[in-house]
Structures are given as C-alpha cells and as structure tokens.
C-alpha cells in the first residue's frame, strides 16, 4: 500500500539521522529535494540550539559525534537513496512525487511533522542549496524569537 511504503521510507530517513545524532537530538530536521538533482541535508536542535550535521560536537555534550566526511557521506547516501525510492513508490502508485520534503521529528515525544511541496521550489535565481539555507535560517529565527522554544543560538 502506498502510504505504508512512503511512511517506511520517511521513517528510515529519520532513523539514520537519529542514529547519526546518537539519540541526543531534541529535534531532527531533514531537507529532501528532488528537482532534477537530489539534495538531502539534516540539522539538529539540541538544548534549544541548532547545529548543522558537521557541528554536532559543538553542542557541549559529553559524547563525541562522528562528524567525519565519511560518516556524513554515508548518511547522505542513505537519505539520497530513500529520496529515489520515494520517487519510485510514487511512480508505482501513480502518485505525485514531492519536489521538496521538510521532515521534523522529535524523538522524545515521537512527534513527526512533514511539509511537502509538489511544485518546483527553485529557479534561475534560487537553488536547492538556497532553499535549504533559508529553512535553516527560518528555524533559527523561530528559536531566537521564542516562537517554538526558548531562545537559543545557532551553530552553523
């Protein structure tokens, strides 16, 4: 069934990112774009601060995260494969393929939120990288403005 296969792939994306953060993240953010090129990125909220995947060791926790290029590459490979599989599942069931998925998961509460866009989000002036950076900055502003959680800082 479409929903089951689609959900299982999203769960796999969340699982690999949760594993990457060793379960310490309060929120996991996954950006998955599929507009001719596939781009996957992930960042984390820990103790009301945002951290891009390469900066998790700046969180000041007593755990050492493997932020090596090799480990980051392995995570991105899995995320990219899952994005391709999502496209295949959508095609198999004649469903529209999301051009952009913004997934947010809170491991402690198991709260999951997904925002899907089915129209291209890029243009000659705006790249998928620009859109990822804009989402990161949007979440940063929410933290700093106290809209979602107590004020924090962002580690880029």
What is each residue range found by the language model?
Residues 1-4, 65-70:
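Short N-terminal edge-element motif at the start of the domain
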Residues 1-56:
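N-terminal "first-domain core" detector
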Residues 7-18, 76, 80, 84, ...:
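Generic detector of well-ordered alpha-helical segments enriched in charged/polar residues
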Residues 16-20, 89, 138, 142:
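Surface-exposed polar/charged interaction patches
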Residues 20-24, 28, 93, 97, ...:
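Short secondary-structure junctions and interdomain/linker hinges
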Residues 36-67, 105, 113-127:
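Extended intrinsically disordered, low-complexity coil regions enriched in Ser, Thr, Gly, Ala
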Residues 72-123:
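Amphipathic protein-protein interaction modules
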Residues 107-156:
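Acidic, proline/glycine-rich low-complexity IDRs
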């Amino acid at each position: 069934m479409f929903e089951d296969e689609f959900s299982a792939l999203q769960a796999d994306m969340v699982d690999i990112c949760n594993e990457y953060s060793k379960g310490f993240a309060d929120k996991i953010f996954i950006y998955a774009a599929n507009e001719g090129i596939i781009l996957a990125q992930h960042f984390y909220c820990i103790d009301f601060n945002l951290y891009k995947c390469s900066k998790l060791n700046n969180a000041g926790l007593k755990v050492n995260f493997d932020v090596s290029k090799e480990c980051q590459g392995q995570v991105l490979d899995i995320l990219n494969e899952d994005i391709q599989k999502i496209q295949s599942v959508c095609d198999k069931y004649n469903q529209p393929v999301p051009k952009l998925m913004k997934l947010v998961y809170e491991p402690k509460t198991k709260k999951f939120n997904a925002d899907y866009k089915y129209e291209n989000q890029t243009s000659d002036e705006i790249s998928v990288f620009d859109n990822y950076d804009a989402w990161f900055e949007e979440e940063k502003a929410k933290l700093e403005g106290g809209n979602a959680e107590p004020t924090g800082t962002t580690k880029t």
